[in-house]
């Protein structure tokens, strides 16, 4: 059962990998350095010696970490891949909390929104984006 506008399974994973690579390149073009993907820890269960299931063990603070040259400030990036609109509810509570806390502690928090047409690096907190709000893509 798919939610409207969202992909599932392998197609979603392929799209996510392409989006993450586009974000990495956009961060590099914006001048950030030491850009690293944050690895999600996984747990694998076995049945009779064979893998049965895999699931994320813990929530991570974001999708990428980087450093701002010149200042050495920490950069935390959360990536969202949505066409047309990005809803506040597309961000999970722990993702919003991590972006908020990182910003509050003096780091640079970025919401990277990937549409089919563009990568937008939005500085957190994003103006006029909050509970019940939606951002609209500038792409046609």
Residue ranges and their predicted role:
Residues 1-56:
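Acidic-basic catalytic patches of nuclease active cores, encompassing PD-(D/E)XK
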Residues 100-129:
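Nucleic-acid nuclease catalytic cores
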Residues 59-61, 107:
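Short, surface-exposed coil-to-beta transition loops
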Residues 125-140:
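Short, electropositive alpha-helical surface patch
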Residues 20, 60, 92-95:
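Amphipathic coiled-coil/heptad-repeat helices and related helical stalk/stem segments
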Residues 82-102:
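Mg2+/Mn2+-dependent nuclease catalytic core
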Residues 56-57, 70:
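Short basic alpha-helical hairpin corresponding to helix-turn-helix/winged-helix-like nucleic-acid-binding
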Residues 62-84:
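Conserved catalytic cores of phosphodiester-cleaving nucleases, focusing on short active-site segments
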